[in-house]
Amino acid sequence: MTTNYIFVTGGVVSSLGKGIAAASLAAILEARGLNVTIMKLDPYINVDPGTMSPIQHGEVFVTEDGAETDLDLGHYERFIRTKMSRRNNFTTGRIYSDVLRKERRGDYLGATVQVIPHITNAIKERVLEGGEGHDVVLVEIGGTVGDIESLPFLEAIRQLAVDIGREHALFMHLTLVPYLAAAGEVKTKPTQHSVKELLSIGIQPDILICRSDRAVPANERAKIALFCNVPEKAVISMKDVDSIYKIPGLLKSQGLDDYICKRFSLNCPEANLSEWEQVIYEEANPAGEVTIGMVGKYIELPDAYKSVIEALKHGGLKNRVTVNIKLIDSQDVETRGVEILKDLDAILIPGGFGYRGVEGKIATARYARENNIPYLGICLGMQVALIEFARNVAGMDNANSTEFVPDCKYPVVALITEWRDEDGNVEVRSEKSDLGGTMRLGAQQCQLSDDSLVRQLYGAPTIVERHRHRYEVNNMLLKQIEAAGLRVAGRSGDDQLVEIIEVPNHPWFVACQFHPEFTSTPRDGHPLFAGFVKAANEHQKRQAK
């Protein structure tokens, strides 16, 4: 089987939506019956985004095999059925790390190690490896054409197109076509200069995606085609839309998938986008709305919680309600009190690290528990719920996590000291271990209690969810907390770790150590988020009586 590659680049400015465009195109090709995957090549020096600040980089998306990756991989999984893995995302740092390791081993037999050919060859090898077994692979190059950091990646894909043959390679370039109100027209010059920059490094784009706040007129697309040496039918207008799930239909309506299939000589049926049409219909025709408060520490950049926000919206789709998300800084709860949590239909505390704002999260969990407000805690959101219950119900004064107070009297949350590494070997860790790549990561099995709420929601006794954490419930103190009324609703496959807790005498109080947001999609939703939004809707109706 021959694999075809579409290399996706961006020009003029960053944040044009390369990831959404690539994912939308992949969704159309998948709807035509093709086996599609998407890769993201990031030009930063970090080995992976695992230790990067969420305020700088946004969320870290965790794959089933435990890779800490760019948030764009979350978009990919929400648009196509193919699951991402560590093969789908790599960085400059990862490439250099691998090349330097080989150099130290003597693999290069004393040769002078250079960007060309050693770095570019390493990039090409990873791209080809990631594409194995697929009909079409979309490869998104992070950054903007012209950035010095992107040059090795651009050179590598230029070479790769020659290696595999131009009949199996396409270059798709996203570019900004701004509208100037003073002139009353869109301007094509930035696009022309962006293509000129690409040409200077040996890449002639085959497709141009023109990003604008409005549809780019046919005459302007013809002008772009003429000056950029691209067929007119390959100049695609991608205007701003009120829902990202409309983009597959927008691209298909302009024949982008037909053009690509003809170029690759792929004989496949027309795309059936009925599932996406259903998503768009549900989104546009809600029967009501709810307001959910999300209490976190990185709220100045909503992308830090991208998958959680999307999963809440998916939960809304399954309940035919619009979910309004109120982002609340947990430090504001500390300084202004729980009064700022009034008038919420439900409360969610997402994952996070570090002590800043933790007491605000603990106060939030208490407020939700004592006032019968639906509560969903994720990762740290479960740990603060446990700490709150231990302090205020189980009589364990000043209970805490050893992450925040190492020598606390009641360490109800503590570091797991023994882990399985990628090869399955036992590895001992401590507070002094490296932060990067030293967490419990990826898909793990969880056994659900028969009498639990989550057992009803999932409809299965065993589930698999993705994790990203170092700290867990301390089993040494668990019996005392359970005796006070807390229910352990889910345990790890080996029965050693607490994965889900519930407060039984509460309308809806669920907290999990894993990250359910990573497996939620607009077409399928997720049982926890669907149940949570339903509980929010029911709470709103009770309050209205």
Curated annotation (Swiss-Prot):
Pfam families: CTP_synth_N, GATase. Residues 291-542 form the Glutamine amidotransferase type-1 domain. GO terms for biological process: 'de novo' CTP biosynthetic process; pyrimidine nucleobase biosynthetic process. L-glutamine binds at G352, L380, G381, M382, Q383, E403, R470. The keyword Transmembrane does not apply. ATP binds at S15, L16, G17, K18, G19, I20, D72, K239, D240, V241. Homotetramer. This is CTP synthase. It comes from the Bacteria. Gene3D superfamilies: 3.40.50.880, P-loop containing nucleotide triphosphate hydrolases. CTPSs have evolved a hybrid strategy for distinguishing between UTP and CTP. The overlapping regions of the product feedback inhibitory and substrate sites recognize a common feature in both compounds, the triphosphate moiety. To differentiate isosteric substrate and product pyrimidine rings, an additional pocket far from the expected kinase/ligase catalytic site, specifically recognizes the cytosine and ribose portions of the product inhibitor. It comes from Salmonella agona (strain SL483). The active site is at C379 (nucleophile), H515, E517. NCBIfam families: PRK05380.1, PyrG. Keywords: ATP-binding, Glutamine amidotransferase, Ligase, Magnesium, Metal-binding, Nucleotide-binding, Pyrimidine biosynthesis. The keyword 4Fe-4S does not apply. Catalyzes the ATP-dependent amination of UTP to CTP with either L-glutamine or ammonia as the source of nitrogen. Regulates intracellular CTP levels through interactions with the four ribonucleotide triphosphates. PANTHER family: CTP SYNTHASE, CTP SYNTHASE-RELATED.
